[in-house]
Amino acid sequence: MMRFLDGHPPGYDLTYNDVFIVPNRSEVASRFDVDLSTADGSGTTIPVVVANMTAVAGRRMAETVARRGGIVILPQDLPIPAVKQTVAFVKSRDLVLDTPVTLAPDDSVSDAMALIHKRAHGVAVVILEGRPIGLVRESSCLGVDRFTRVRDIAVTDYVTAPAGTEPRKIFDLLEHAPVDVAVLTDADGTLAGVLSRTGAIRAGIYTPATDSAGRLRIGAAVGINGDVGAKARALAEAGVDVLVIDTAHGHQVKTLDAIKAVSALDLGLPLAAGNVVSAEGTRDLLKAGANVVKVGVGPGAMCTTRMMTGVGRPQFSAVLECASAARQLGGHIWADGGIRHPRDVALALAAGASNVMIGSWFAGTYESPGDLMRDRDDQPYKESYGMASKRAVVARTGADNPFDRARKALFEEGISTSRMGLDPDRGGVEDLIDHITSGVRSTCTYVGASNLAELHERAVVGVQSGAGFAEGHPLPAGW
């Protein structure tokens, strides 16, 4: 199991910034020889779970992340009918092709500009009676009257291919194409999807997270109030693949009762629950019937719990202790919160997490549900907010009477409005997944691990000063 460099854990708790991994002798020759799949029942083939945050987890995010091997957990405040629609949408998506934004020929340039950035590939497909007739790029819309019809500006010189064409062939066809996106059609000529050159490469690297029927996987969260069992059953009937019982303070009797109620239904789905930061909390949740425990109180970017209450724990130490306790009972943990760099993912996995939950980092992507906005310097951003914030509480308590709703809104513990800028080099969630998995694969080669279990077994972790952490930062502007 993971050990500390000097053989002894320090007498104080640690964050991800406080620690580093020491390289070991390795026989792993290539990053592509590393298996990133997990064994916690979630079905992920990369250790990435998207947090159940309204500003992050929607159907575009769910489709895209599952295609690359992760899974999205839909937020608990999403109504059951909306969950059903989202699950049906995601499970009907192609395992290779992206679902494009579509426009009718008479839609306006203004309509196109509002929709193009819903997807990272940067185009919208103009369709007539289900068949593609052109592509619209952002550059096509610049300097054009916003009421112009898209049929008048659509690009008609683009690569087409039948659905089922090998991604490598699509890659080759796009080498000298004027638009870096191929449009694929079914036998009757109707639109099947699109694929970019980068998407074609990714199709050969990632394995989609799929259910027993070969469809993309998706999860959903439920809170601990009301008839939790009925809500969980409704989510299972909607077709979700993973259930998450979610509350800020998971180590309470109400959470344990909710876990027992859902576990007793025997729905045949993996059950995650949280959040906790101690071995005792982990054991209690697993004994109540959870298969996976979510670990983290206060490390998230949108969370103010520690500053409001003084409650929480540095995340690396919390993950390390809880993972050890879970392993003794045959359970697993997800490291939830505090992830800002690929190294943090690697450290959480080295400490024993089976998956890492990411929220705010993914809010600043094309695939997150929010609208793309621009600041005064024309830099793109999206809004994010915490799930215990006033904004989220108001949305979640919409069915309450006005007095109760106002009373609950007084006790928010999160940021209601935050700007997450889109990285110009990594604007899509797939770009961030590439960034993360590349880092974790490299970690494994440095450690001599061919899979995540071996990473945890072989990792040697040291403790560093703030200056040590700063030393590891690149200096692109020199010094």
Curated annotation (Swiss-Prot):
Pathway: Purine metabolism; IMP biosynthesis via salvage pathway. The gene is guaB1. InterPro entries: Aldolase_TIM, CBS_dom, CBS_dom_sf, GMP_reductase, GUAB1, IMP_DH, IMP_DH_GMPRt. SUPFAM superfamilies: CBS-domain pair (SSF54631), Inosine monophosphate dehydrogenase (IMPDH) (SSF51412). CDD domains: CBS_pair_SF, IMPDH. Its cofactor is a monovalent cation. Keywords: CBS domain, NADP, Oxidoreductase, Purine salvage, Repeat. Residues 96-153, 154-212 form the CBS domain. Was identified as a high-confidence drug target. NADP(+) binds at residues 246-248, 296-298. It comes from Mycobacterium tuberculosis (strain ATCC 25618 / H37Rv). The active site is at 303 (thioimidate intermediate). Its EC number is 1.7.1.7. Homooctamer composed of two tetramers. Activity is highest with Rb(+), followed by K(+), NH4(+) and Cs(+). This is GMP reductase. Involved in the purine-salvage pathway. Catalyzes the NADPH-dependent conversion of GMP to IMP. Has no inosine-5'-monophosphate dehydrogenase (IMPDH) activity.
